[in-house]
C-alpha cells in the first residue's frame, strides 16, 4: 500500500516535470527571438548574471552554448563583479539577467543602473509579473512549478 502511494506520487511528479518542459518548449516556439539574437550578434561585449547557484549554472551553459558561434559571454558572479562591471558598460553591450522570482534586490538594483546607462538587457524569470522583467529591455519567461 505504501509503495503504491509512493509510485503514484512519483508518477504525478514525472507528469508535472514533463508538462513543464512542454510549456517551456511551446513558449519558446511562440516567442519572437529575432531582436534578442540581433543584440547578441551585434553587441560589443556580452555578459550574463544569475542571482543564485542554479541561475549561475545557467549562465555557464549560455556561455558554453554561444562559444560555438564565436559569441563569448562573460559570466558575472556576486555583487562586486556585477556592480564593477556595470560602471563600464554602454549601449553597445548586452547583459542577460537570470532570476527565479525576478525580485532579487541586487538584480533589480543592477537592472535599474543598466537601464539608466542604456544597456540592452534580457531577463529570464519565472512566468509572473516581476520587477526585473519590467526593468529589462526584453523578457523570457520560464514556466515553473513547485512540487512537494
Predicted regions and their residues:
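HTH-adjacent hinge/linker in prokaryotic transcriptional regulators
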Residues: 1-31
